[in-house]
């Protein structure tokens, strides 16, 4: 499981996650996620919210819902075409009022990247700092 996309995204045993805009072949794309629980709604608190973006301009409209689902200590992963990566950072900064920051990115499949956003350290719960 260590080299699957699931492992790289931190999705594994005991992880509760949800997806937005996942492709039809999502299970194959993700790989072995162990005993992770996939919710089909964005009811918080989620450990991981995985958002597939065809267009980074959707960030402004969806950010509040996605980040609320991951609050207080989860992560929002945005999956987009690698050429869109530079557009993700300022869009999230603006949509979150600077309260969320990127701290990791990975190459996935088909020329895509996934960028992880977490709350700024000083706004996280003490046990997650």
Regions found by a protein language model. Give the residues of each.
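Short, glycine-rich nucleotide/cofactor-binding loops
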Residues: 49-59
């Amino acid at each position: 499981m260590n080299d699957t996309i699931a492992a790289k995204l931190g999705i594994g045993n005991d992880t509760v996650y949800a997806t937005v805009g996942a492709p039809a072949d999502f299970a194959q794309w993700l790989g072995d996620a162990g005993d992770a629980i996939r919710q089909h709604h964005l009811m918080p608190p989620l450990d991981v919210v995985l958002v597939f973006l065809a267009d980074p301009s959707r960030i402004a409209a969806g950010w509040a819902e996605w980040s609320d689902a991951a609050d207080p200590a989860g992560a929002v992963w945005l999956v987009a075409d690698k050429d869109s990566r530079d557009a993700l950072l300022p869009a999230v900064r603006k949509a979150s009022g600077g309260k969320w920051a990127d701290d990791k990115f990975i190459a996935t499949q088909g020329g895509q990247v996934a960028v992880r956003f977490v709350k700024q350290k000083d706004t996280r719960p003490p046990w997650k700092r």
